[in-house]
Amino acid sequence: MSNEFINFEKISRESWKTLHQKAKALLTQEELKSITSLNDNISINDVIDIYLPLINLIQVYKIAQENLSFSKSLFLKKDIQLRPFIIGISGSVAVGKSTTSRLLQLLLSRTHPNSQVELVTTDGFLYPNQFLIEQGLLNRKGFPESYNMELLLDFLDSIKNGQTAFAPVYSHDIYDIIPNQKQSFNNPDFLIVEGINVFQNQQNNRLYMSDYFDFSIYIDADSSHIETWYIERFLSILKLAKCDPHNYYAQYAQLPRSEAIAFARNVWKTVNLENLEKFIEPTRNRAELILHKSADHKIDEIYLKK
């Protein structure tokens, strides 16, 4: 961490866990296992030490958002309109964004039982493979230019204004957008937006996705550790794909282990590492909170914007 983080308060794990009174984890070990991504590693103690204080912090921001909205309505002499509380979660491929997002969705649902808590991933806003092929962009999939940012910004604008919104659905099994399938959102109380690009906007330098966020999180780790996690995840995906000939990764499932590792390492270095270093990591200081992971996936440091 460098002067890039001069505007952040660094908090150790030991200090962070004292910011919430000891309580039950609000979920069972089985539930935690069901929402944990392939090759990610999270324990009930992590939930208690890291995520319960985080839920408290989100509540602080939510109260502040509601108070500001109320005050603005009075100032403008308009009816009070409660808007969805939008949380953006970013970080590299294979760093654990999906686990964090699903866990926050579950914990927010438990702590706000009368609230609607929804989750959307920006994968659904990738252009379909056919379009990427036609534009010569298939090998740039995941880079900023491969996303339909106009559609994504329109989606967020509809959500923020309390309108029903629809998001395309992406399947990792077929490595493409599912045709004619949409996920609908009807004015949720909380919306979690997860993706590698949630702090980026390639097409409109005057408007960022983060302009719509009420709270934002960046999952951080040393790139060498993320590379290891990426390769481990790739091998796990290949094991699952062996049983499904329709799975996109089935074409790689018969590779000898050494060749599969070499293939994954090459993809990491030529695609994911470049994307991380050029487009993802430079946006992390736009987050309100940075959760830093050590080699064993455990969050060891927290950075909160001052």
From Swiss-Prot:
EC number(s) from the headed UniProt entry: 2.7.1.33
Pathway(s) served: Cofactor biosynthesis; coenzyme A biosynthesis; CoA from (R)-pantothenate: step 1/5
Enzymatic reactions: (R)-pantothenate + ATP = (R)-4'-phosphopantothenate + ADP + H(+)
InterPro entries: P-loop_NTPase (IPR027417), PanK (IPR004566), PRK/URK (IPR006083)
Pfam families (alphabetical): PRK (PF00485)
One MF annotation (Gene Ontology) recorded for this entry: ATP binding
Residues reported in the UniProt entry to bind ATP: G91, S92, V93, A94, V95, G96, K97, S98
Subcellular location field: Cytoplasm
GO cellular component terms, A-Z: cytoplasm
Record-stated family: Belongs to the prokaryotic pantothenate kinase family.
Protein name: Pantothenate kinase
